[in-house]
Swiss-Prot record:
It catalyses: 1-(2-carboxyphenylamino)-1-deoxy-D-ribulose 5-phosphate + H(+) = (1S,2R)-1-C-(indol-3-yl)glycerol 3-phosphate + CO2 + H2O. NCBIfam families: PRK00278.1-2, PRK00278.1-6, PRK00278.2-4. Keywords: Amino-acid biosynthesis, Aromatic amino acid biosynthesis, Decarboxylase, Lyase, Tryptophan biosynthesis. Coiled coil: none annotated. One of its GO terms (molecular function) is phosphoribosylanthranilate isomerase activity. Belongs to the TrpC family. InterPro entries: Aldolase_TIM, Indole-3-glycerol_P_synth, Indole-3-glycerol_P_synth_dom, Indole-3-GlycerolPSynthase_CS, RibuloseP-bd_barrel. CDD domains: IGPS. Its EC number is 4.1.1.48. The lineage of its organism: Bacteria, Pseudomonadati, Pseudomonadota, Betaproteobacteria, Burkholderiales. It comes from the Bacteria. This is Indole-3-glycerol phosphate synthase 1. GO terms for biological process: L-tryptophan biosynthetic process. Pfam families: IGPS.
Length: 267
């Protein structure tokens, strides 16, 4: 595990402990379960939205709403989540990914609420999930999917978090970087496997990470390539290998209009 990831996970444990004191687990769980049947906040079907795009022969883009990152600093000083989400929806995104980590990515729960309310797209809570509390919290905020990072979790906890998400009607995107992590991810039932092309130890990025893992990927999984998709040639390279789902953030966040950049990149 990288030093930065260890640091983030330590902070997450502290955040969860503090959140539990502010609002106990039964309260969060009750809100999450109530939201499941709410006409506005009920789950929108994240995995199905990706399948629909791919089935129509198009790239399935998970468009990220991200103000900053630890490695790149502030990406978008004029950060308006609702406006960004609306632009993504207008220009063909399949889903949203919204950063809710405050300390390292300058995200916030309100950004998830605002982005999701601004359009009809399903939304991923992009954060470092280490506790069941966060899963209930995600659904209480309206999240349709959570991220599980294999390198951050032991197998038992990862399975427990996945089961909780599915019980609440959410999908799960499980993230890997190498063959060992993929083997662990495939023990879960989720069809969504994200391959992070960025090495969290060195921060080097190569699309060969996704391409190298494809031969080990079962046909029933949807591969989501993450990080390093910066130009149309990157998209063509992935689609030529039958990778049709993409999580893109930085390229969009640095553009004047994120949705227009999405349309250009995936034209």
């Amino acid at each position: 595990m990288s030093d930065i990831l260890q640091k983030i996970l330590a902070v997450k444990a502290e955040e969860v402990a503090a959140a539990r004191k502010h609002r106990d687990l039964p309260s969060v769980r009750a809100e999450a379960e109530a939201n499941r049947h709410d006409s506005t906040l009920g789950p929108r079907g994240f995995a199905q939205a990706l399948r629909d795009k791919i089935g129509a022969g198009r790239a399935a883009v998970i468009a990220e709403v991200k103000k900053a990152s630890p490695s790149k600093g502030v990406l978008r000083p004029d950060f308006k989540p609702a406006e960004i989400a609306g632009s993504y929806a207008e220009h063909g995104a399949a889903c949203l990914s919204v950063l809710t980590d405050e300390q390292f990515f300058q995200g916030h729960a309100d950004y998830l609420r605002e982005a999701r309310a601004a359009c009809a797209l399903p939304a991923l809570r992009k954060d470092f999930m280490v506790d069941l509390y966060q899963v209930y919290e995600a659904r209480s905020w309206g999240a349709d999917c959570i991220l599980l990072i294999v390198s951050a979790l032991d197998q038992g906890l990862m399975a427990e978090l996945e089961a909780c998400a599915h019980e609440l009607g959410m999908d799960v995107l499980v993230e890997v970087h190498d063959g060992h992590e993929l083997e662990r991810a495939l023990r879960l039932s989720t069809p969504l496997v994200g391959v992070n092309n960025r090495n969290l130890r060195t921060f080097e990025t190569t699309l060969d990470t996704t391409l190298g893992l494809l031969k080990h990927m079962p046909d029933d999984r949807i591969v989501v390539t993450e990080s390093g998709i910066l130009k149309p040639d990157d998209v063509r390279k992935m689609r030529a290998a039958d990778v049709n789902a993409f999580l893109v953030g930085e390229a969009f966040m640095r553009a004047d209009d994120p949705g227009t950049e999405l349309a250009r990149l995936f034209a």
